[in-house]
Amino acid sequence: MNINVADLLNGNYILLLFVVLALGLCLGKLRLGSVQLGNSIGVLVVSLLLGQQHFSINTDALNLGFMLFIFCVGVEAGPNFFSIFFRDGKNYLMLALVMVGSALLIALGLGKLFGWDIGLTAGMLAGSMTSTPVLVGAGDTLRHSGIASTQLSSALDNLSLGYALTYLIGLVSLIVGARYLPKLQHQDLQTSAQQIARERGLDTDANRKVYLPVIRAYRVGPELVAWTDGKNLRELGIYRQTGCYIERIRRNGILANPDGDAVLQMGDEIALVGYPDAHARLDPSLRNGKEVFDRDLLDMRIVTEEIVVKNHNAVGRRLAQLKLTDHGCFLNRVIRSQIEMPIDDNVVLNKGDVLQVSGDARRVKTIADRIGFISIHSQVTDLLAFCAFFIIGLMIGMITFQFSNFSFGIGNAAGLLFAGIMLGFLRANHPTFGYIPQGALNMVKEFGLMVFMAGVGLSAGSGISNGLGAVGGQMLIAGLVVSLVPVVICFLFGAYVLRMNRALLFGAMMGARTCAPAMEIISDTARSNIPALGYAGTYAIANVLLTLAGTLIVIIWPGLG
């Protein structure tokens, strides 16, 4: 039996799509030196090559892919978007605007200089910024621009061609820039990180290990009684001195949870809860009595929960003001926009921040009720909310504004992005509404992006050979300029206008470019995770601005003549 693979793929769009995805994902795992190609560029390259052989898929799959992707981008940005936009993120907002705005203007200028069409120009901007949201926003706006079908087809083909030719240029140049640009300034990042660590009391260890608290029990001996000198637990401040707190006391056979007025007596058996290193550092006076193994005394349910910050008495306050240790709880992690932040008493909490807290189950529940809610540990997605807001986004995208002879439509990209932001924001405020497990969100977002990349590659593949010969050299120059010049402008603006700490500034610059590999290099250079503060500050707003940039470049282009 002979099977014609070409006929088989041409006759089955679904099979072709998944063949492209599988081959592209395999290619994306390859590395060029220390740089991994990545899933998007792998799928795009494979789809372009197959597109040259005249394979194609239904455009409905491409449209659904980009819609799912951009909606999920909005959902991820939602919890922190408004807090960054309206409150303490002025510097981060300005940096993101400078980065995206300067890249947009430079791309427009180069496009006109080289005589490209809007498709090549927008694709070059998306690739140089390594930003799929730009590609998605531009593609959607082109489809709703009302231009002739032949021009539209050419523009869409050139859009994906420009992206494919400049993506690796943008990625590699930014990674190289992240490695060497910090060395060109007068203050190295490690010094900057240490400086802000001293000012704010930050934990600078980028590789900080997180341990769960453990319980050990001791019998109170004469040295501990002498050390307490009749003071109650509140006056002693056991946690401040030892890193452990007393969770239970057994006295005369009676087990009790002590309050701050309790005074230790000879023969008491106490259960101490703390991290392993805190137990190891205990003063001998606390351990001079015999360690005991009392099952009832040690029988506590220590849990680790992720608490989402929501309540007004926590939002806008500093971590130190929560006084978690006074309530017998231990803070393990602070996560903002999926970025782990340094453990810093002076970090101001935003709505939607996630605190990973360990302690007795009862105490953790009390803390969660005070500052927000415990994140749902469920694998069930609220599909009703997902679908409802998706529909709302599509309806918003249908809105068109008419100005004399000029009409402007919001478009599906902007509509779905806004609807996704609202769903993410409401989810951060209402624990039972719109829940989407992070794994499910990542999967839908990544799948939508890969389907979109496969579609644009297959549709543009037939013209890639001609495109390479005509604009290959120009694309190389333009890609480098659009990738690096906005970074330099952003650095000068942040360093000399905003006067930001360099470690925070470089993190914020990488966040404005939404480039995680470059962020890792900045953290390695600083030998600290402090740049993550800046990265998280600009990341959410930059994703939104980049999508809008893709829309704006298409709208502005006709007016430039």
Swiss-Prot record:
* Subcellular location per the Swiss-Prot or TrEMBL entry: Cell membrane
Q: Which Gene3D superfamilies match?
A: Regulator of K+ conductance, C-terminal domain (3.30.70.1450)
Domain of life assignment: Bacteria
Task: Supply the alphabetized keyword list.
Answer: Cell membrane, Membrane, Repeat, Transmembrane, Transmembrane helix, Transport
For this protein, the parts annotated as crossing the membrane are: 8-28, 32-52, 66-86, 94-114, 158-178, 383-403, 406-426, 447-467, 475-495, 540-560
A single Gene Ontology biological process assigned to it is:
potassium ion transport
Q: How does it sit in the membrane?
A: Multi-pass membrane protein
Where it mainly occurs, coarsely classed, is membrane
Q: Which InterPro entries match?
A: AAE_transporter, RCK_C, RCK_C_sf, Transp_YbjL_put, YidE_YbjL
GO-annotated cellular components: plasma membrane
Q: Which GO terms describe its molecular function?
A: monoatomic cation transmembrane transporter activity
Q: Does the keyword Endoplasmic reticulum apply?
A: no
RCK C-terminal domain segment(s): 200-288, 292-373
Homology family: Belongs to the AAE transporter (TC 2.A.81) family. YbjL subfamily.
Q: What is the designated name of this protein? A: Putative transport protein YbjL
